[in-house]
């Protein structure tokens, strides 16, 4: 079994761990981002992240926090493959020599290209995930009811064909290009800083987790406004925003102001470290198992593997 395949499998395990740990935070984020503006005299649907968790669990049960998880879980391995491929192509296009070390800007360029590639795979899963996440128990009168991921695909296709399934592509590009650029450049920069100088640079597990966690924060720090617009566009009724993300932006700024573009900030930041820690734990454990059982040659340790910036 080739080392490329082994690293792909390990990456898939790491990505799955990320989804499982991070999805409840993501559900809270999406619900806060998409909650309707309260009418004069009315209280908001959720007063914050903790209130969203309490209300969701009390009304729908604990596993409501995992609504829509199937789509990112199924897509995480191919997403890793596309992301790694995009990074490799981005680096190859800029290198004059295979051993050339990439600069901060070059890594950002490679990450940006990878963000374009992953969007193609990511959009349908994001659309399905968001629609299931905002669907609440006892809300049959609020719109279309979905019984699961396949039912979402079937109903979206019936409503508007493939274009409905891929709604939010532009918004996802607006989110993932700068986010992936920030993630890869910060991760590679911190990896070099933490591993020291010399030919035998090594990175401890703790430093690896720190680099991944800080890179995750950098990733989300630059893309939350675009993520808010994407979530609203992908969960809106058919035909509400005929001019796409521009219509969402105008409505948000007109009705709620610029601060609304940062809704869901704390759930996103709170999930950055545990989600990345879970990713590296799954990655390391799988690679260690391959080495223990003598499978393949020498699969690349996680210090050389770049985890995905977006688990879902």
UniProtKB/Swiss-Prot annotation:
Bilayer topology term: Multi-pass membrane protein
Record localization: Mitochondrion inner membrane
A Pfam family annotated for this UniProt entry: Mito_carr
Keywords: Developmental protein, Membrane, Mitochondrion, Mitochondrion inner membrane, Repeat, Transmembrane, Transmembrane helix, Transport
GO molecular function, one term: ATP:ADP antiporter activity
Summary of the function given for this chain in its UniProt record: Seems to play a role in the maintenance of tissue differentiation in the developing embryo, but not for its initiation.
GO CC entries: mitochondrial envelope; mitochondrial inner membrane
Record family assignment: Belongs to the mitochondrial carrier (TC 2.A.29) family.
Superkingdom assignment: Eukaryota
One BP term from GO: mitochondrial ADP transmembrane transport
Solcar repeat coordinates: 2-93, 102-193, 203-289
This protein's name: Protein dif-1
Record-annotated membrane-spanning stretches: 5-25, 69-89, 104-124, 172-192, 209-229, 261-282
Species name: Caenorhabditis elegans
